[in-house]
Amino acid sequence: MKKVHLIQADITAFAVHAIVNSANKSLLGGGGLDYVIHKKAGPLMKEECVRLNQEKGGCPTGQAEVTTAGNLPAKYLIHAVGPRWLDGEHNEPQLLCDAYSNALFKANEIHALTVSFPCISTGVYGFPPQKAAEIAIGTILSMLPQYDHVAEVFFICREDENYLIYKNILSNIDDPNIQILIS
């Protein structure tokens, strides 16, 4: 049975096979969590991001790329590029859904058994937290059963507001194929 966990913690200190980074299009580091991950992961991960930027021009919004996790407690980093919130009329919900689904696809592709997700786009990109949580949870729960390799997903919320929103949504889910665990 697949498992989905909700934990309030620092995603950079949580050991899993793959950590999803809320990245920007350049993959070269930005603000918020992206800045923290780049700082803590170190030079090897940064070199891979520079290479991806040079070879592919970065990563389009809604897509994801994989690098080493460097000094973080994971084997891989999956850099998912979420959208900036403008007004909800510029395809932002679909792009956020795509960011989560492509990150999960990449996790399965690299045979990650466990993967942690942050609250993509809710920080400096300004996506409304309630709407973002609904999209994140809905996307992961609908796609997770399709994948053979990913056994556990961890939603890691640092801020109280996001944690409480995720907790409220996940507490009301009853899926016979997925065990929901709230810490």
UniProtKB/Swiss-Prot annotation:
Does the keyword section mention Disulfide bond?
no
Instruction: Give all residue intervals belonging to the Macro domain.
Output: 1-174
Q: Keywords on this record? A: Plasmid
SMART domains associated with the record: A1pp (SM00506)
SUPFAM superfamilies referenced in this protein's UniProt entry, alphabetically: Macro domain-like
List the InterPro entries hit by this protein, alphabetically: Macro_dom, Macro_dom-like
Pfam families in the cross-refs: Macro (PF01661)
**Family listed:** Belongs to the MacroD-type family.
- Kindly provide the name given to this protein in its UniProt entry: Macro domain-containing protein
What's the source species' lineage? Bacteria, Pseudomonadati, Pseudomonadota, Gammaproteobacteria, Moraxellales
